[in-house]
A protein has these predicted regions:
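Class I SAM-dependent methyltransferase "Motif I" SAM/SAH-binding loop
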Residues: 40-44
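C-terminal lobe and adjacent flexible extensions of AdoMet/dcAdoMet transferase-like proteins
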Residues: 194-234
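Class I SAM-dependent methyltransferase SAM/SAH-binding core
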Residues: 47-92
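Conserved class I S-adenosyl-L-methionine
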Residues: 1-34
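SAM-dependent methyltransferase
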Residues: 136-199
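A short acidic, Gly/Pro-enriched loop at the edge of an enzyme's catalytic core
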Residues: 94-101
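A conserved beta-strand element that flanks and buttresses the S-adenosyl-L-methionine
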Residues: 103-105
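A short glycine-rich, Lys/Arg-flanked "PGG" loop and its adjoining helix->strand segment in the class I
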Residues: 119-131
Length: 234
């Protein structure tokens, strides 16, 4: 059972304020053309707007509950025919097709807690790409003031939805707990520096095309967020 199953109905209200990445990923998909693969597709926060642009999305997620919500949302949006939703994970995505774009939005690679699993996941993403195809994803590494302001405290993220961040700066992990009327869960994320992500991408056989500081592709000059575009060499 995925940690997200118990908050599948809560997920959209919990993440409703996260919108800054949607247009970026939609544009990347339009540039690549159908089909695209979205890893950790969740409830379709990005996949459904992508499909609304006429792009076929192969969406992979390890949570049956999240996929169920995604299917229902896609039906309401009138794009269910463009979404091919499959149960699977980052390490072995069940995709036989080879595509020009694989995405892994909303920091989902941070669920991988060691370099072995990170390399496995990056290698799996690479195997889905045609030569010249691109992997696009975003991650973060927390700033000291964020850790200080949030550590060990229940904070109301959205009305009636609370989250608690427990940071371990030695292990570089975040244990995040979420609770609301629709459910509760706890999961662990692990962060790396940009230099470490670059090294892993290169070790996995990618050529890094860009490391940006935000979804408008501003140059990375320090800060918490990094947005990566990497290519499978031809």
């Amino acid at each position: 059972m995925s940690a997200y199953d118990s908050i599948a109905e809560l997920y959209d209200p919990w993440s409703r304020s996260v919108t800054e990445d949607v247009a970026f990923y939609v544009e990347e998909a339009k540039r690549a053309g159908s089909p695209v693969v979205e890893l950790a597709v969740g409830t379709g926060r990005i996949a459904i707007p992508t499909a609304a642009e006429g792009i076929r999305v192969i969406g992979i997620d390890s949570s049956p509950g999240m996929l169920e919500v995604c299917r229902a949302r896609a039906e309401l949006a009138g794009v269910a025919g463009l979404l091919d939703l499959r149960l699977g994970d980052l390490l072995e995505p069940p995709v036989e097709e080879r595509v020009r774009l694989v995405t892994c939005p909303f920091r989902s690679y941070l669920h991988l807690l060691d370099d072995d699993s990170r390399l496995r996941a990056l290698g799996a993403a690479r195997s889905l790409l045609v030569p010249g195809g691109r992997l696009v994803f975003d991650v973060f590494a927390p700033a000291a003031d964020d850790i200080e302001e949030t550590h060990g405290r229940w904070l109301e993220r959205e009305p009636g939805i609370f989250e608690r961040a427990d940071w371990d700066t030695n292990a570089r992990t975040l244990t995040l707990s979420v609770r609301g009327e629709g459910g509760a869960t706890t999961f662990t994320l692990a962060w790396l520096s940009p230099d470490e992500w670059r090294a892993l991408l290169e070790k996995a056989g990618f050529q890094v095309l860009g490391c940006y500081g935000w979804f408008d592709k501003r140059p990375y000059r320090g800060g918490e967020d990094t947005v990566w575009i990497a290519r499978r060499p031809r």
